[in-house]
Regions:
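An N-cap/entry alpha-helix motif that binds or orients negatively charged groups
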Residues: 1-9, 403-440
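Hydrophobic faces of well-ordered beta-strands that scaffold small-molecule active sites
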Residues: 6-14, 61-63, 107-109, 129-131, ...
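Canonical Radical SAM [4Fe-4S] cluster-binding loop centered on the CxxxCxxC motif
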Residues: 6-7, 11-45, 68-69, 439-482, ...
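Glycine-rich, proline-tolerant flexible connector loops at the mouths of alpha/beta enzymes
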Residues: 8-14, 34, 64-84, 207-219, ...
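Active-site beta-loop-alpha junctions enriched in small/polar residues
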Residues: 13-15, 66-68, 110-114, 134-136, ...
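Conserved, mostly hydrophobic/aromatic
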Residues: 24, 63, 131, 161, ...
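Conserved Radical SAM active-site core
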Residues: 33-195, 386, 464-627
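Auxiliary Fe-S-binding modules of radical SAM enzymes
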Residues: 47, 54, 103, 184-418, ...
Length: 763
């Protein structure tokens, strides 16, 4: 996450119960039984609130409640027993699980001073928890009627949360009768707890605002000077990794809070009020965004659990909530920022698989964009470009002719808000310098010759067979004559390339791939054979016991011209161990492509992004392939392939994100253009996974190529993509002409294709 980022949590506020055994002098949240319609919200009422929040794009369900109301009010205990619960915390645990299951919102339990046992129960259903320290001064009049507000109880809860490794939110309430030394004491106690346990993710500095109908209604409000001073104290006393938050609805100018040192605005709800401060409505996100941008910052959504904790789930998250956090995370473990709903996805086996996915989604549908979905992405480019801080420095370095290294590439991937447009704008400048206003495409046909595979790639929804992870669907293996027929059909439709890919069939040896090449060339001698990944040729050579350079030379002589870069996935072995544990390693992929280039073959660089990896892995992938290109000049293009999650086994096993966000997709193409400048001049958008409307945005972010017309593309469709199965040049033309570009057909190796009329005249 960039240092220029200001975060907030899009949330709904769920007041589970407004009954409380404490009577604080400043509180309007707590009510008596006579003033509430029921002691607790019902499950149905809770789901109405949570569902509305999920539809509005929220990630958090903030459960706020009075402390131990059953200890004070018999009606509370009676209600709980009638509904099958013994305590408020027991009911809270059940409702957190309900919201998690039905809406996917991440519960944040703000249940007050709890003991070890109750905190542990909530840890299973709530990725983060919170409790305000408020103040450690024991003689505050404001806390005279509040047995749960003693310093001992608050500190005991803070420490118990640390012992249980709970990502924890706490804070101080200023202006309730304490003085500056009291604030310092509380902040130092919080800092000491964090130094011991490492669990404090954020500290709220909340200013007291007097409210009518409270004992402190005539008490003066906390001054802005005191608030600013307290924020500065927090920033100086707390360890730097602890985030500092202040509620923006309790001040007239939220910019003051940023100037004082906060980096988080806290929870902001588009659908519910601030039930603790109902007289102070949430500021609109556009207002907060403008405030942040006026100070060179960008506003970004986060989850209830901060990235520092979400990226180490084994320590900080219970197994029960890990996937729920992952499912709403982007690659930096921030909140996914595409507008729309993100509901939990449920699947059942498809009745008729064909060439599509083996599972179908049932139940409530998400409306946010994701790779392969039949919906429009948000408009990120073109937009007004503006960057500050590290992103601006990295962009300026590129403009000065510097080659971005791994650190600079990671920085560019951290761009948010107007920084995304700035990265895209530079990428588009470099695109124009390399390619002008021409957008290219190739007429081709995919021939997926078998879907039987002995390898166990955890992301693959395409392969079928006894050793694959997906056992439904009909395995097939095309005959040579079927392959030849498809090549001739492709030629009749104007294709210049066939793209050959398939599973690693247990009956194949290396001669099979040679035979396929000869079959294609016999059917249509001038057809370009683009086929066989590094995995296929490496495995073919291994099964023959032949050195790979020798085998590649024989493949070349049989008609192979270029290799697809697929099988690269992410060129980092820590990621490959999860995605493709029995596949070739990073070095084996790189070595294979280097040998292919030395044999006179060409290939491309692909990257499958958006599953389990992070920006540092993207950067390593780019640097490693760039270094190879410097030695061989054999790569023709860079093709980002967004992970399509819907029918992917690793997603169905709840171990992957739901693909990249649109921001990440734009950046992958733009940063790729920047990182490969001068070495790989062509950047392609995969319309199969992005749709043609998405591809149009990317043409303004560094992309110059739309790939192939792809008759018979069924690998992406097997993973659940809605796109695929062919597109026409007229479809491409409708994408490029509205943005002032010219469409041109190319060969696989980016040579111009002679127009059909000219070829016929030449005959």
């Amino acid at each position: 996450m960039s240092a220029t980022t200001v975060t907030y949590s899009p949330k709904v506020f769920i007041p589970l119960t407004m009954l409380c055994r404490d009577r604080c002098g400043y509180c309007t949240f707590a009510q008596s039984p006579a003033r509430v319609s029921a002691p607790y919200l019902t499950p149905e009422e809770i789901l109405v609130i949570a569902t509305a929040g999920s539809r509005a794009g929220c990630h958090e369900a903030l459960f706020t409640l009075g402390e131990f109301p059953e200890e004070r009010y018999p009606v509370a205990g009676e209600w709980l027993r009638e509904h099958g619960y013994q305590t408020t915390v027991e009911y809270l645990v059940a409702m957190c699980q309900l919201v998690l299951d039905e809406t996917g919102l991440l519960p944040h339990a703000n249940a007050g001073a709890l003991g070890h046992e109750d905190l542990a129960k909530l840890r299973r259903v709530s990725p983060s928890q919170g409790m305000m320290i408020e103040s450690l001064r024991p003689d505050l009049v404001a806390h005279r009627g509040a047995p749960d507000k003693t310093p001992e109880r608050r500190l005991a809860t803070l420490h118990a949360a640390g012992e249980l490794a709970i990502p924890f939110t706490t804070g101080i309430l200023i202006g309730i009768g304490e003085d500056r030394s009291d604030r310092i004491e509380a902040l130092e106690a919080i800092a000491a707890a964090h130094e011991r346990f490492g669990h404090v993710q954020e500290v709220i500095v909340q200013n007291f605002v007097p409210k009518a109908d409270t004992l402190m209604r005539n008490h003066p409000a906390c001054s802005i000077d005191d608030l600013v001073d307290a924020i500065r104290l927090a920033r100086s006393i707390l360890p730097p990794e602890v985030h500092v938050q202040a509620p923006p609805n309790l001040v007239d100018d939220p910019g003051i809070l940023l100037d004082a040192g906060i980096d988080d605005f806290g929870g902001i709800s588009p659908v519910t009020a601030d039930h603790v401060n109902p007289e102070r409505p949430w500021p609109h996100l556009d207002t907060l965004r403008a405030v942040a941008e006026s100070r060179g910052r960008n506003l970004a959504p986060r989850l209830t659990v901060y990235p520092e904790f979400a990226t180490n789930p084994r320590r900080w998250l219970d197994d029960n909530v890990r996937f729920a956090v992952l499912d709403r995370s982007d690659a930096e473990s921030m909140g996914r920022d595409d507008p729309g709903a993100t509901f939990p996805e449920r699947y059942e086996a498809a009745a008729n698989v064909g060439s599509g996915a083996e599972v179908v989604q049932i139940g409530r549908r998400s409306t946010a964009w994701y790779s392969g979905a039949d919906r429009l992405p948000p408009l990120l480019v073109p937009a007004e470009p503006r960057a500050t801080g590290a992103v601006a420095e990295a962009l300026e370095g590129v403009r000065q002719g510097q080659e971005p290294g791994e650190a600079e590439i990671v920085t560019l991937f951290s761009a948010r808000g107007t920084e995304v447009a700035a990265v895209a704008a530079l990428a588009d400048e470099l695109r124009f310098a390399a390619n002008g206003e021409t957008v290219t495409f190739v007429r081709n046909r995919n021939i997926n010759y078998t879907n039987v595979c002995t390898f166990k790639c955890t992301f693959c929804g395409f392969s079928k067979g006894p050793l694959s992870l997906n056992l439904r669907g009909k395995p097939y293996l095309l005959s040579n004559e079927e392959i030849a027929d498809r090549v001739r059909e492709a030629d009749a439709l104007g294709a210049t390339e066939v793209c050959l890919q398939g599973g690693i069939h247990p009956d194949f040896d290396g001669d099979y791939y040679l035979e396929v090449c000869r079959t294609v060339k016999a059917a249509v001698p001038e057809m370009h054979v683009h086929g066989f990944t590094a995995l296929e040729v490496t495995e073919g050579a291994r099964r023959l016991g032949e050195p790979l350079p020798s085998y590649l030379a024989r493949m070349r002589d049989a008609g192979l011209k270029s290799l697809p870069g697929t099988a690269a996935e992410i060129l980092d072995d820590s990621i490959r161990e999860v995605l493709c544990p029995d596949k070739i390693t990073t070095n084996e992929w790189l070595d294979c492509h280097e040998m292919a280039h030395e044999a006179g073959l060409r290939s491309n660089v692909t990257i499958m992004f958006g599953s389990i990896e992070h920006p540092k892995h993207w950067a390593r992938h780019m640097v490693r392939t760039r270094e190879l290109q410097k030695r061989t000049l054999g790569f023709t293009e860079f093709i980002p392939l967004p992970f399509v999650h819907m029918a992917s086994p690793i997603y169905l096993k709840r171990r992957a994100r739901r693909g990249p966000t649109w921001r990440e997709t734009v950046l992958m193409h733009a940063v790729g253009r920047i990182a490969y400048r001068g070495w790989i001049d062509n950047v392609q958008a995969s319309w199969v996974k992005l749709g043609v409307v998405g591809a149009q945005q990317l043409l303004q972010a560094g992309v110059n190529d739309l790939g192939g017309t792809l008759m018979d593309e069924n690998i992406s469709r097997a993973a659940g993509a809605a796109h695929g199965q062919g597109i026409t040049p007229d479809d491409f033309r409708a994408v490029v002409e509205p943005i002032g570009r010219t469409l041109r057909q190319r060969t696989t190796l980016y040579e111009p294709v002679q127009p059909l009329a000219t070829k016929e005249a030449a005959r």
